[in-house]
Amino acid sequence: MTTQILPVILSGGSGTRLWPLSREQHPKQLLALHGDASLLQATATRLAGFTGALEVAAQPLVVCNEEYRFITAEQLRAAGRPASALILEPMGRNTAPALTLAALAAGEGDPVLLVMPADHVVTDRAAFQQAIDAGAQLARDGAVVTFGIVPDRPETGYGYIQTGEGTAHGARRIARFVEKPDLETAGRYVSSGEYLWNSGLFMMKASVWLKAIERYRPDILAACRNAIANGARDADFMRADKAAFAACPSDSIDYAVMEKLPSDAAAGIEAHVVPMSCGWSDVGAWDALWQVADKDAAGNATRGDVMLHETRGSLVLADGRMVACIGVDDVVVVETPDAVLVASKAHTQEVKQIVGRLKQAGRSEVTNHRKVYRPWGWYDSIDAGPRFQVKRIVVNPGASLSLQMHHHRAEHWIVVTGTARVTRGDEVFLVSENQSTYIPLGTKHRLENPGKVPLEMIEVQSGAYLGEDDIVRFQDTYGRG
């Protein structure tokens, strides 16, 4: 059997430093931050047209949080790269357990795993693929390979890899991994030419990773084996057992394995780093997005309805409303329907401090966008006040909401486009454009779109309590309780 490259996409990050666009229920890998595709979609298509020594499997293996399973699957389908399996983590345990789950689920043929975080940007796909081709040939022969970004400036936000002697395919030995340095130390690293940025990209055979994790962290391997053995398969979703995975220690690929390999000859596993210059960024903060974004002559990167005057070196993103900036330099302005961020570009790492305070205050802006995606479509909470809430709801063709009931609210539905099939108690009837219906408090009901075009409607809720947790589900197509 020919050895294949199996892309393994790790899609579990939250990206709190990219608030207010990134939220707990809609993290940065699901956002279109650089171009029209989301970061996840761009990652899934990054090997398109690959012509290296090894073939690439047509479908990636994706590890993601259970909360994001439906939108992750839909984005991959829309990108033409549906996953061979979506491995669902019931909770985050960092990258070493995530990769171990993927290696256990990789199937026959002992493929070379290309481990890619879902939330990176690469602007030079050809250079990326050339480096992957080099790494794949080393990994096919049993090595563990990481990829180091050739630095173009001193950077304190990344870890570094000190390189040793050259090996095959343009790679080098790994001398050591170094934590994020201060600016002076980072400058020395860049000047020496011996150091690369740690990209978080890896390649190795599935069997080699399992051998390494068994040597250094057998507790992680045992917990992941239990989680897979006691998990469940539901169509394309592979659910890790919650109790077994909860017992798994949290650790990163670097700490669990990579930092130990270079000094452990007895392991019998070579560790190489392939230098890479491909316009890479982990987009860890708003200033990092500005670095890779297209800019005008004044160094401004904009998106949406933006007007600038006497403004330089800034990142301005408008999601819905018009944003104007006058006489400001080196700022970040991010507008969303329910929150606006204004920050100095030099302080964007501190956005997480605001997120922490929002969490402490119990603010919904840290958790959800006003527009919330569901497996059946999405809704936008366009207005709310005492005892009422107004939503714009879009249901995908052929999709349906659960058969449900609310204890504390009634609902009025007005169809804007499409046709709705409504279950209300014992009744089942159609509601067409410009028609409406009413769902009394405490009545079992269901909304379906039987048509071939999206169903759009306005919902007005009224009652004493309007929280999303006031719901009793009796039947649900998507397995939600």
Features from the language model and the residues they span:
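Short coil/turn connectors at secondary-structure junctions
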Residues: 3-5, 57-58, 81-83, 108-111, ...
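Alpha-helical scaffold segments in soluble metabolic enzymes
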Residues: 29, 42, 46, 71, ...
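A short acidic, often aromatic-flanked loop/helix-cap motif at beta-alpha or helix-coil junctions
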Residues: 92-97, 153-155, 183-185, 280-281, ...
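Conserved core of the sugar-phosphate nucleotidyltransferase
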Residues: 123-247
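Left-handed beta-helix
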Residues: 3-4, 207-414, 419-438, 445, ...
